[in-house]
Every structure is written in C-alpha cells, then in structure tokens.
C-alpha cells in the first residue's frame, strides 16, 4: 500500500494535459507552441534495443563535426510528443547530443487515451522498466561516434523529472541532473516505499531542480525538504521555486499551464547548468 502512482485526481490536479472530453490530445494547441527547426542540426526517429524489445526514440545533434555531451531528456506521462521532440531539438541547437526514449510503447502509447486510462498505464509500469528504458537511451547515445561518453546529463519533466532523480541515484556515470517538477514522493508498483527521499544519498551528480510554487500536486514544502535532504550528502544542489507557476509550466503546447517568464528563465538556467558541468 506504500505505492504512490498518480491517481486520476492527481493527473487532473497537475493540469499537465491538453484534453478534449477528457481524452489526451497532444498537439491540439500546437499553434501556440515553440517550433524549433532542424537548421544546423541532425534529428531523427530511431529504435532502441531494450533486452528483447525495441522501443522508439528520438535524437538530435549539431550538424557540424565534433563530439558532443549527451543529454537524455525524459518525457512526462504524455510520452514522446511533438513538443518533447522539440525540446530535444532545442538541446541540439545548444550544442548537445540529446535523446528521448518513448517510455509507453509497450503499453500502446498515450495518444488519444482518456485521463483515467493514462493514470492507470503510468502506474502499471515498474521502476525497473522505466529505468531500463532510460539506461538503454543513455548507453546508445554514449556509443555514438559524435558523443562525449564521459559527459552525461539527464533531465526530465513531470514523471520524467522523478525518473531523473531515480536514474541519477542508480547511475554513477551521470554528470549532471536537471529534474523539472518531478514528484519527490512518487513510488512505483515494483518498488513500494522507494521515493526520491529514499535514494537521495546515492545521488552524487550536481542537481538543479526546477519547480512551480503553485504546483497543486507537489507541495513546495516537499520540494524544500527534498532539497535539504540532498544537500546532506551532495554539495552541488540548487532548487528554484517559481512563484505562481503551476505544474508543467514549461509545456508551451499547453496554454492553460504554460508560464512564459518562468519557462524562459528555467531553460536558461538548465542550459547554463549543463554548460558548466557537461562542456567543461
């Protein structure tokens, strides 16, 4: 009973989805979304091998020859949407080799699903599977000729933010981590009781946390408590709480939650943080 997956109520509290009649419809508000083209970068849809399974992924890197730090960008519970692919391209434009795995391929993807089903699917996936998919993306990226395998950044949004913390705890090769509004008390069906607090002492990489002070699903007190917990064993920790910013404030394809000023400041901080630790 210690499992704390997202319930339907929590999904709706997060306000992280564009919906019509309660059905997830990524892209309905793309007219307002940021569009990053592929000038100067190479972007593609790929497949990753995870054990005996293949899952889709998306990667992008600068077009010019060179070796680039790796950034694994973990999506939220909407999966590998067009907006998330755009974020991957933004990292490439900033001089990184970025990759994002589709975490919900085995479950039939999230597009067109109603919120109760979305919550059920995300809760049914174990920590081991989630982290295995992220590991596959990181290993694939690090093996490419244009990658700097000794510079691995990880970042993620919503559920991907929580996975950013868990992956960093289990992966000593992570150089820097940037969780965006990741639930610090989220646990998994195969790991009851194992939330971010439980693994905080194992996170050795520098961490920049980007959270909204008006997030109805993640109390500011929890964020501050987790920051304090991390700082007990990690000297390179910084958390930012944006006033009046709700959950998913970076989602420019969702005008009901997007907060331009907070999103732009957080993006600048994210890039500066990765530049400091990954481009050194």
Please report, for each region that a protein language model flagged, where it lies by residue.
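N-terminal cap/lid segment of alpha/beta-hydrolase-fold proteins
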Residues: 33-63
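Short beta-strand element of the alpha/beta-hydrolase
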Residues: 68-75
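Short beta-strand/loop motif that positions the catalytic acidic residue
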Residues: 203, 209-211
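Cap/lid segment of the alpha/beta-hydrolase catalytic domain
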Residues: 104-128, 251-253
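Primarily recognizes the serine-hydrolase "nucleophile elbow" in alpha/beta-hydrolase
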Residues: 136-198
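Alpha/beta-hydrolase active-site loop
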Residues: 120-143
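N-terminal secretory signal peptides and thylakoid transit peptides that target proteins
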Residues: 1-19
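C-terminal catalytic histidine-bearing segment of alpha/beta-hydrolase fold enzymes
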Residues: 234-280
């Amino acid at each position: 009973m210690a499992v704390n997956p997202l319930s339907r109520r929590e999904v709706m509290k997060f306000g992280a989805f564009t919906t019509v009649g309660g059905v997830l419809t990524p892209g309905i508000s793309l007219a307002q979304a940021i569009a990053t083209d592929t000038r100067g970068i190479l972007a593609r849809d790929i497949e990753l091998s995870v054990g005996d399974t293949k899952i889709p992924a998306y990667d992008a890197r600068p077009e010019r020859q060179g070796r680039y730090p790796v950034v694994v960008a973990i999506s939220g519970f909407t999966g590998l949407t067009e907006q998330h692919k755009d974020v991957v391209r933004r990292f490439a434009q900033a001089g990184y080799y970025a990759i994002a795995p589709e975490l919900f391929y085995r479950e039939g993807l999230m597009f067109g699903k109603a919120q109760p089903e979305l919550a059920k699917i995300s809760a049914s996936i174990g920590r081991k599977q989630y982290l295995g998919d992220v590991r596959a993306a990181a290993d694939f990226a690090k093996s490419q000729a244009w990658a700097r395998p000794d510079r691995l950044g990880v970042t993620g949004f919503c559920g991907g933010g929580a996975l950013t913390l868990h992956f960093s705890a289990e992966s000593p090769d992570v150089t820097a981590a940037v969780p965006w509004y990741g639930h610090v008390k989220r646990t998994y069906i195969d790991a009851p009781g194992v939330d971010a607090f439980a693994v905080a002492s194992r996170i050795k990489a520098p961490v920049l946390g980007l959270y909204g002070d008006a997030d109805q699903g993640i109390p500011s007190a929890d964020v501050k408590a987790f920051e304090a917990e991390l700082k007990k064993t990690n000297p390179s920790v910084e958390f930012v709480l944006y006033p009046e910013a709700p959950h998913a404030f970076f989602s420019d394809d969702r005008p009901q939650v997007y907060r331009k000023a907070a999103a732009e400041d957080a993006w600048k901080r994210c890039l500066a943080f990765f530049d400091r630790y990954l481009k050194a």
